[in-house]
Amino acid sequence: MIKLYQFDELRPEEILNRDIRAEKNVEDVVDGILADVRARGDAALKEYALKFDGASIEELQVTQAEIDEAFANMDPYFLETLKEAAANIEAFHRQQVHKNFVMNDKPGVVLGQKYTPIEKAGVYVPGGTAAYPSTVLMDVIPAKVAGVSEIVMTTPAGKDGRVNPVILAAAATAGVTKIFKTGGAQAVAALAYGTESIPAVDKIVGPGNIYVATAKRKVFGKVGIDMIAGPSEILVLADGGCDPAWVAADLLSQAEHDKLASPVLVTDSEALAKAVQAELEVQIPQLPRAAIARASVDDNGKIIVCTDLHKAIEACNIIAPEHLEVCVEDPFGVLNEIKNAGSIFLGRNVPEALGDYFAGPNHTLPTSGTARFSSPLGVDDFVKKSSFLYYTRDALEVVAPRIADFAEREGLHAHARSVTIRYE
């Protein structure tokens, strides 16, 4: 059963409860895979596909015929859903596009900043027991909107050597350039270093298991990465007017993801807390993934009862959750009090699943408290900004003495000389 706590009796570390430890051998395993793929390229990828996925792969790249077949056999209703979701995601992310700017308010001086998309992006899409076409849309479309010219996707093949057709349909809908049949840390290595088939990219995005996350951390610096994603989190901030069955269902929407997922309710109502506690016991046995949800709720879930709504918001800001549902009477009235959250779902009719699949804001979000200093995946992740400056000879001459003086005070006389030599 989910545990119930009083906020005023908890220490900060008890509120957070993120003591997730990786297996001791993960680092060594990932180091070996990275080195192997870097040395042997495609051959190593094919061996790992057989070893980890049971897939015998002849050609790593997905063919156009495979993509066409996926579309031909896809449920038309779901294809329309994909297209509508993609349109929503694109419309939202187009609002994130920055404009270059120029300043020329001083005689002979032009200053500015310009945005340039990265050239190649790598998108990792998990495989395993479930297919995640939503991840494809969320990770690819911002890159497309940003203007990335080459978007390379990797995802594990099934035992039949084929990629799930739902993933292929989503990739084609989103605008992926190339798709390759490889997963795990080996896919991250291929995207970072390149192989005979897979081009090295400039940045890798997308969620994965502990091996994928560790590999991304290790190749950072050779390439950019979006974030190191931990287990999924949901925090429901609810007042006494909420339906406990709805709250329980929302908590379980994340609990079914992973045994390490963290479902949390923060409320100013003791009655709601106890009702949700009971409702979870009713709903968990009804789920197809009941064992996973049970482990998540019992081991990582909690209900925190606060004396008032402002204290409840304080708890939310300490936790800095990935997903924050604000299920209160006036959600917009408290929005500005919320400082730390990956994505904020306002009102009682906005379940987290709406954002996961359809509304438009990105669902690749900071976890493990990193919403204190980081943001959801977006167009910014796929662009670079460069400043530029231009001075005429006369404009430089006006400020040259000050520049030279500044440089000499730092003991950098060559800096000073690079200015003064122009006027000798």
Where are these regions (language model features)?
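N-terminal Rossmann-like NAD(P)+-binding subdomain of aldehyde/semialdehyde dehydrogenases
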Residues: 1-119
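Short internal beta-strands
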Residues: 149-159, 263-270, 276, 347
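Alpha-helix C-terminal capping segments
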Residues: 138-149, 172-174, 192-198, 216-218, ...
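A conserved active-site cap/scaffold subdomain adjacent to cofactor or substrate pockets
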Residues: 227-299, 303
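Conserved small-residue-rich beta-alpha loop and adjacent elements
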Residues: 103-169
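C-terminal core of ALDH-fold dehydrogenases
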Residues: 318-424
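Conserved NAD(P)+-binding/catalytic subdomain of aldehyde/semialdehyde dehydrogenases
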Residues: 175-246, 250-253, 257-262
